[in-house]
A protein has these predicted regions:
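Short, Lys/Arg-enriched N-terminal segments with co-localized hydrophobic residues
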Residues: 10, 18-34
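Non-transmembrane, aqueous-exposed alpha-helical and coiled segments at domain scale
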Residues: 31, 35-458
């Protein structure tokens, strides 16, 4: 294609503004929590239900931006169009008139994205360059990143980190070494080939000398670009300029995070973290709008704990107790299908996650899953040696921490059809109120099922 293809100037806002304004009016009427710019983030280990929350509130937003991470974790969304496991696509893709953006902080896996686009459009969802845009400054996750991820996990053996082997850590390592290719380079094939040749010489040294693996050829890489990179070219543009215009026109922007605070590279349980920043504070940088002010941070918390991967997990259940909760909550990884590690809600970790995210509002998800329990367990403190603490400890100490568990009465009834706070059983309300007090943040949303409408506004 011609140099600069996909970089057409913005000539007008492509949204159905009247429809959006009508949606906002409805939100105001029902007492929604709609602010100009909002981030929806995970408070714990990920898998909290961020996708279902983004899908719920996007009717009140103009733009949804994914600002970090890659295809290594999934967001499950259930709506009138079906059930979807999204890995790279922003969860606003199902809403008419919403522009979805993959920001510069994303690990752009063209291969996974193209397969995901095919899967979602096959279920009747329209995806065009009008409602999906890819930052020209997003870096490409290349085939060798996935190879290196698997090779390193194999080398580590029983000391592995539990990677999803999607190439995320090698990708971000290369990005910080300035050894990646930007998506915008797909618009300039001649320069792209030259850049890939330079990277190839360097990367093949690692593959062959460190891991004794097969090297790549430039022909293999160009074939990969032709098969996958070419397909996403129409979506690539200067999304920073688009977002600045949106901000100037007072459009509402929703920032969608991947994973949770406890997986954040700087604030999580290092080294059992992801390789990017999952905190809301990174949203302006990773989205391509560093001047953005975030008015609200909706932190998503599951009504119990779940975790995929290795590392300390203080409240973990095992055996039959764990399997019952896992089956009740369908706790299997959206990307890997791996059984998630599960246990009761961890107030210590959740309070820390709320603080890291500077959450202003909490969405508590999957409350309905706990309906089978006679007593609801809650980890209220940790025992470290001879002392107890309610402060989240330094990562190196976490492996020694033991949970101090207290119990509240269960409600033992199906609450999946409840839609108002007053109709929840008293025991369920007390459980929510207890969590709210202990973590120090208002719980404004309570979900009682995976469907879009299975939500209680407080």
């Amino acid at each position: 294609g011609a140099p600069g293809a996909g970089q057409a100037p913005i000539t007008g806002w492509p949204l159905a503004v009247s429809k959006r304004n009508a949606a906002r009016s409805r939100a105001a009427a029902r007492g929604g929590f709609i602010m100009s710019n909002c981030a929806i983030v995970g408070i714990n280990w990920g898998d909290e239900g961020k996708g279902r929350m983004v899908d719920l509130v996007t009717q009140d937003y103009d733009v949804v931006v994914r600002y970090q991470g890659g295809g290594n974790a999934g967001h499950t969304v259930v709506n009138e169009k079906g059930k979807f496991a999204l890995h790279l696509l922003p969860s606003g893709i199902f809403r008419d008139g919403v522009v979805n953006i993959l920001g510069n902080g994303v690990a752009l896996d063209c291969e996974s994205l193209w397969k995901e686009l095919q899967d979602v459009t096959a279920q009747g969802v329209s995806i065009t360059p009008d409602n999906l845009m890819i930052s020209d400054r997003a870096s490409l996750l290349l085939p060798w990143h996935r190879d290196l991820d698997g090779l390193e996990e194999a080398r580590l053996k029983d000391k592995k980190y539990g990677s999803t082997k999607q190439g995320i850590a090698p990708f971000y390592s290369d990005k910080f070494q300035k050894k990646t290719v930007m998506a915008g380079e797909l618009l300039y094939p001649g320069q792209l080939r030259s850049h890939l040749e330079d990277l190839l010489e360097w990367k093949n040294l690692t593959l062959t000398k460190v891991y004794n693996a097969q090297p790549y050829t430039i022909e293999q890489l160009m074939d990969w670009v032709a098969e996958y990179g070419e397909k996403i070219r129409p979506f690539i543009r200067d999304t920073g300029a688009f977002l600045r215009q949106a901000q100037a026109e007072n459009k509402r922007i929703l920032f969608e995070a991947q994973l949770g605070a406890l997986r954040d590279l700087d604030y999580g349980i290092y080294p059992y973290t992801t390789s990017s920043n999952a905190v809301a504070a990174y949203a302006p940088v990773g989205s391509g709008l560093p001047s953005a002010r975030i008015d609200e941070v909706i932190g998503v918390v599951k009504a119990y704990s779940s975790c995929v991967g290795e590392g300390p997990f203080t409240c973990e259940w095992f055996g039959e107790e764990a399997e019952k909760l896992r089956q009740a909550g369908n706790e299997y990884g959206a990307k890997t299908g791996r059984p998630r590690r599960v246990g009761p809600i961890d107030i210590v970790a959740t309070r820390y996650g709320v603080q890291c995210q500077a959450a202003t509002n909490i969405a508590l998800t999957k409350l309905d899953v706990l309906s089978y329990l006679d007593k609801i367990p809650i980890c209220v403190r940790y025992e470290l040696g001879s002392q107890q603490t309610d402060r989240f400890p330094f990562p190196a100490l976490l492996a020694e921490a033991k949970p101090v568990v207290e119990y509240m009465d269960g409600w033992k009834c199906d609450i999946s059809g409840v839609r108002t706070w007053k109709d929840l059983p008293e025991a369920a309300r007390k459980y929510v109120e207890y969590i709210e007090r202990e973590i120090g943040c208002r719980i404004g949303y309570v979900s009682v099922g995976p469907e879009r409408e299975a939500i209680i506004l407080r």
